Amino acid sequence: MVLIRVLANLLLLQLSYAQKSSELVVGGDECNINEHRSLVFLYNSSFGCGGTLINQQWVLSAAHCDMENVQIYLGLHNLRLRNQDEQIRVAEEKFFCLSNKSYTKWDKDIMLIRLNSSVTYNTHIAPLSLPSSPPRVGSVCRIMGWGAITSPNETFPNVPHCANINILRYSVCRAAYRGLPAQSRTLCAGILQGGIGSCMGDSGGPLICNGEIQGIVSWGDDICAQPHKPVHYTKVFDYSDWIQSIIAGNTTATCPL
């Protein structure tokens, strides 16, 4: 299951916000209002995804979150209450590993978005650093978003929820999901006993370890947070050179094989 959701409701409020948003965490608690300054919401009135601000003009998300006419919301907390620090941008240009936007569940599910204008940092908006090294197995990392907090009967909050999960050995994911290759440019992460995990609509959001974005929510089981059913996250460290090359202006840079 790719962790994306068709939103049933159009955005409400003055500039229209969704009553049911598209990024969340089963088993988490409401995030501190200053904890998710890099978290962004991608929305086009039908679909929603998460993303991560990595500098004033660039957002990182998942390739399967690509959508037309997307608006990018920064500085959000409660989707039904406006705050003065919010900013909205659109995508000026999108970059993918392959020109045909091809990706698999274990490779190249990554999208880099150049915003139409630079973001102004403030109390509720700040970038997240790219990884300096990959996370170790056993590392405790943070997930966050506004999506489903129960599964399979989905309920959605108005505020983002956060939770801690662990980096697991890739062999755990291979045992949980048949057909995976021997190696992958993904991270396997979750709680083995279940009860906590990324869920429907969390796609594109961050996996944060030691203050760095180490993963991008990619896919998991149809029923979220089940025992021995962790989630796959695109391994950002493997794409760091590609990301930095694109940002530096080398728009023909290629992803790792």
UniProtKB/Swiss-Prot annotation:
GO terms for molecular function: serine-type endopeptidase activity; toxin activity. GO terms for biological process: proteolysis. InterPro entries: Peptidase_S1_PA, Peptidase_S1_PA_chymotrypsin, Peptidase_S1A, Trypsin_dom, TRYPSIN_HIS, TRYPSIN_SER. GO terms for cellular component: extracellular region; secretory granule. It is an enzyme of class 3 (hydrolase). Partial deglycosylation has not effect on enzyme activity. Negative results: does not cleave the gamma chain of fibrinogen, does not show fibrinolytic activity, and does not induce or inhibit platelet aggregation. This is Chymotrypsin-like protease VLCTLP. It comes from Macrovipera lebetinus.
